[in-house]
C-alpha cells in the first residue's frame, strides 16, 4: 500500500491532498479512522480480460465506497493487468492496448460499473509494459481520459520511477512520462521500489533517488498534474 501526496499549483499549496490505496480486506476500523484524513481512496484492484471484460475483486468493496462518501473522500477504482496468478501480465497489456474493440469494450464496461457503484475516479496501474507497446499504452490512457471525463470521472496513471528518458529496463521503457502526463488528468510517481526482495541491498525509497525521479518528472509533466507516491 502507498500514500499519494499530490502537488498542485502555487495558489493551492496551503491545501494538502492525500490519497491512499486499500484492499477490500482492510480492517473496517482502520479504514474508518483513516478516511477523515484522505482526499481519495484508491481501491485495489480491478482486473480485465483480453476481450475487455472487467474482473471485480473477490471481496465486496461497496462498503468501502459508501464509507468514503460518508467522510467526503472520493473512491477511486484501481485498474491492474493481473493474470490468474495475481501478478502483472505484460502480455495482457499487449492484447488490450493493440485491440481497438477490446479498448472500446473495457472503457464502456468501466464507465457502466463506475457509475453503478459510485466511483469518482480511475487509476490505471499498469507495470512491466513492453517498450513496443509504449505509444499504444499512451493512446489507451488518452482515450480513457477523454471518455471518462465526459462522465465527470478523473483519470490518473501510475508511473515507474524513471530518472531519464532513455532509462533501460522492462519497468521503465514502456512508460512515456511526457506523453502520459499529457494523456491523463494526473500521474502518480512511484518514487519507491528501488530496494526490493531481488535487488541489491538498499532503501526502498532513497532520498537521492526520490529527488531524481521528481526532478525528471517536473521536466516532462506540469507540476499541477503530479502526485508523489510514498511507500
What are these regions (language model features)?
Residues 11-14, 32-37, 69-71, 115-116, ...:
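Extracellular/periplasmic catalytic domains that process cell-envelope and extracellular macromolecules
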Residues 23-25, 46, 80-82, 127-129, ...:
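Active-site beta-loop-alpha junctions enriched in small/polar residues
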Residues 45, 105-136, 185-200:
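Active-site groove signature of glycoside hydrolases
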Residues 50-60, 134-231:
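Substrate-binding surface in catalytic domains of secreted glycosidases
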Residues 95-98, 129, 172, 202:
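Pocket-edge positions in alpha/beta enzyme catalytic cores
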Amino acid at each position: 500500500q502507498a500514500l499519494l501526496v499530490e502537488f498542485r499549483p502555487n495558489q493551492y499549496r496551503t491545501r494538502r491532498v492525500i490519497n491512499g490505496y486499500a484492499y477490500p480486506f482492510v480492517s473496517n476500523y482502520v479504514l474508518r479512522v483513516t478516511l477523515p484524513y484522505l482526499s481519495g481512496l484508491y481501491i485495489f484492484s480491478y482486473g480485465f480480460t483480453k476481450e475487455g471484460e472487467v474482473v471485480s475483486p473477490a471481496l465486496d468493496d461497496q462498503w468501502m465506497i459508501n464509507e468514503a462518501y460518508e467522510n467526503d473522500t472520493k473512491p477511486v477504482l484501481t485498474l491492474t493487468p493481473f493474470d490468474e496468478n495475481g501478478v502483472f501480465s505484460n502480455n495482457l497489456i499487449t492484447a488490450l492496448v493493440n485491440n481497438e474493440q477490446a479498448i472500446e469494450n473495457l472503457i464502456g464496461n468501466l464507465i457502466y460499473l463506475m457509475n453503478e457503484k459510485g466511483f469518482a475516479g480511475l487509476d490505471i496501474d499498469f507495470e512491466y509494459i513492453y517498450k513496443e507497446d509504449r505509444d499504444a499504452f499512451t493512446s489507451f490512457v488518452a482515450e480513457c481520459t477523454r471518455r471518462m471525463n465526459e462522465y465527470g470521472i478523473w483519470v490518473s496513471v501510475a508511473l515507474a520511477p524513471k530518472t531519464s528518458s532513455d532509462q533501460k529496463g522492462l519497468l521503465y521503457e514502456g512508460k512515456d512520462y511526457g506523453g502520459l502526463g499529457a494523456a491523463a488528468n494526473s500521474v502518480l510517481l512511484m518514487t519507491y521500489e528501488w530496494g526490493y526482495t531481488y535487488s541489491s541491498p538498499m532503501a526502498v525509497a532513497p532520498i537521492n533517488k526520490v529527488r531524481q525521479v521528481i526532478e525528471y518528472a517536473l521536466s516532462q509533466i506540469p507540476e499541477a498534474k503530479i502526485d508523489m507516491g510514498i511507500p
